[in-house]
Amino acid sequence: MSRKMTGIVKTFDRKSGKGFIIPSDGRKEVQVHISAFTPRDAEVLIPGLRVEFCRVNGLRGPTAANVYLS
């Protein structure tokens, strides 16, 4: 089950394509992979950007899916 949320990109490593998002509701940070972004948004991805995403339960804990810049 997914839940739509907003948050801020905490970290993002272009080499690995992985990072973390801090949810605006104060919950624990969630993992994000570059494949969760649209190609256009992935090009400008840097820490500090506000995003909208769906929080899903991944194999290694909370994960962000369907991520868009807001």
From Swiss-Prot:
PROSITE patterns associated with the record: CSD_1, CSD_2
Span of domain CSD: 7-67
GO cellular component: cytosol
Principal localisation: cytoplasm
Record carries keyword Transmembrane helix: no
SUPFAM superfamilies, per database record: Nucleic acid-binding proteins
Keyword Cytoplasm annotated: yes
Any Pfam family hit: CSD
GO molecular function annotation: DNA binding; nucleic acid binding
Keywords: Activator, Cytoplasm, DNA-binding, Transcription, Transcription regulation
SMART domains named among the record's database cross-references: CSP (SM00357)
GO biological process, any: regulation of gene expression
Subcellular location, record wording: Cytoplasm
Superkingdom of the organism of origin: Bacteria
UniProt name for this protein: Cold shock-like protein CspH
Lineage: Bacteria, Pseudomonadati, Pseudomonadota, Gammaproteobacteria, Enterobacterales
